[in-house]
Amino acid sequence: MALTLTDVKRIAHLARLEMADADAEHMLGQLNEFFGLVEQMQAVDTAGIAPLAHPIEQIQEVAQRLRDDAVTEVVDRDDNQRPAPAVQDGLYLVPKVIE
């Protein structure tokens, strides 16, 4: 898929972008290079190849590097609501802003 300069200008117009002719020509080159790369990737036969969730999972075992969840502090709702101007049944009361 190759774009033309008219296509780039139309897309810029639809996106409400002001684009000088030199910038549009530069963008045209970049977009056509990108679409060329996409066409090359689509031409590769990937039948029978399982998708990868992580790019290096074929090389080594991949484990998430996250710590285990652990309680670090106890949240006391009453203490947190004490400075609030108005609270009822554990809920913060705020002024009505929409009629």
From Swiss-Prot:
<dbReference type="GO" id="GO:0006412">
    <property type="term" value="P:translation"/>
</dbReference>
<dbReference type="InterPro" id="IPR003837">
    <property type="entry name" value="GatC"/>
</dbReference>
<dbReference type="GO" id="GO:0050567">
    <property type="term" value="F:glutaminyl-tRNA synthase (glutamine-hydrolyzing) activity"/>
</dbReference>
<dbReference type="InterPro" id="IPR036113">
    <property type="entry name" value="Asp/Glu-ADT_sf_sub_c"/>
</dbReference>
<comment type="function">
    <text>Allows the formation of correctly charged Asn-tRNA(Asn) or Gln-tRNA(Gln) through the transamidation of misacylated Asp-tRNA(Asn) or Glu-tRNA(Gln) in organisms which lack either or both of asparaginyl-tRNA or glutaminyl-tRNA synthetases. The reaction takes place in the presence of glutamine and ATP through an activated phospho-Asp-tRNA(Asn) or phospho-Glu-tRNA(Gln).</text>
</comment>
<protein>
    <recommendedName>
        <fullName>Aspartyl/glutamyl-tRNA(Asn/Gln) amidotransferase subunit C</fullName>
        <ecNumber>6.3.5.-</ecNumber>
    </recommendedName>
</protein>
<dbReference type="Pfam" id="PF02686">
    <property type="entry name" value="GatC"/>
</dbReference>
<keyword id="KW-0436">Ligase</keyword>
<dbReference type="GO" id="GO:0005524">
    <property type="term" value="F:ATP binding"/>
</dbReference>
<keyword id="KW-0547">Nucleotide-binding</keyword>
<dbReference type="GO" id="GO:0006450">
    <property type="term" value="P:regulation of translational fidelity"/>
</dbReference>
<dbReference type="GO" id="GO:0050566">
    <property type="term" value="F:asparaginyl-tRNA synthase (glutamine-hydrolyzing) activity"/>
</dbReference>
<comment type="subunit">
    <text>Heterotrimer of A, B and C subunits.</text>
</comment>
<keyword id="KW-0648">Protein biosynthesis</keyword>
<dbReference type="GO" id="GO:0070681">
    <property type="term" value="P:glutaminyl-tRNAGln biosynthesis via transamidation"/>
</dbReference>
<comment type="similarity">
    <text>Belongs to the GatC family.</text>
</comment>
<keyword id="KW-0067">ATP-binding</keyword>
